[in-house]
Amino acid sequence: MYTSKQPFHKSKQTFHKSKQTFRKSKQTFRKFKQPFRKPKQPFRRRPRIGPGDRIDYRNMSLINRFISEQGKILSRRINRLTLKQQRLITLAIKQARILSFLPFRNYENEKQFQAQSISIITGPRPRKNRHIPPLTQKFNSNRNLRNSNQTLRNNNRNLSSDC
C-alpha cells in the first residue's frame, strides 16, 4: 500500500460536463406540459352564515339550518362552517334545547325514520332451505330420549320419597 506524506491537492481545472443533453430533455418535457387554464367563472361557495347573522340561541331561523330532520346537529363537513362558527352554533343549539326553544329530538320525523329502517330490516326474506344431516338428527333424538329418561327417574324418586 502506497501512502504519501504530501497532502492531496485538488486540480485547478474544472470538470465541464456537456449541458446539451439536459437542455434537450427539458425542451421535450415542455412540449407535453399543457398550459394552465383559468376557469371562466370563479367558483366560490357562499357561506351559510352571512356577515350580519348573529349566532345566538334566540335566532331560530339560523339555528334550524344546522339541524337534521331527526333533530341532530349537522357536522362541519355538511355545514361548511369554520371551527369557530361550528362551536358557536353547537353552543347556541344546546342552549336553545335547554331553554326549550328546540326539542332534543324531532319525534315525528324520527318515527318515520324508524318505520323506514324497521321495514328495511324486517322486509321479506328468502327462506333458507334447512337440511339437517341424518347424524345430527340421530344425535338430537338420542339427547331428547336421555332428557325424558332423566325426568322420569327424577319423578320416580320424588314419588318414592313422599311415601
UniProtKB/Swiss-Prot annotation:
Bias type Low complexity, positions: 140-163
Enumerate the residue ranges of region (6 X 7 AA tandem repeats). Answer: 4-52
The domain of life is Eukaryota
- What Pfam families has UniProt attached to this entry? Ribosomal_S18 (PF01084)
Q: Which UniProt keywords apply?
A: Chloroplast, Plastid, Repeat, Ribonucleoprotein, Ribosomal protein, RNA-binding, rRNA-binding
Q: Where are the sequence repeats?
A: 4-10, 11-17, 18-24, 25-31, 32-38, 39-45
Record region (Disordered): 1-54, 121-163
Q: Name one GO biological process term.
A: translation
Q: What InterPro entries has UniProt attached to this entry?
A: Ribosomal_bS18 (IPR001648), Ribosomal_bS18_CS (IPR018275), Ribosomal_bS18_sf (IPR036870)
Query: Would the keyword Secreted be found if you checked this record's keyword annotation?
Result: no
State the GO CC annotations.
chloroplast; mitochondrial small ribosomal subunit; plastid
Compositionally biased residues, Basic residues: 7-48
Q: Where in the cell is it found?
A: Plastid, Chloroplast
Which GO MF term does the entry hold, naming one? structural constituent of ribosome
Task: State how it assembles.
Answer: Part of the 30S ribosomal subunit.
The family this protein is said to belong to = Belongs to the bacterial ribosomal protein bS18 family.
Q: What is this protein called?
A: Small ribosomal subunit protein bS18c
Q: Which organism is it from?
A: Oryza sativa subsp. indica (Rice)
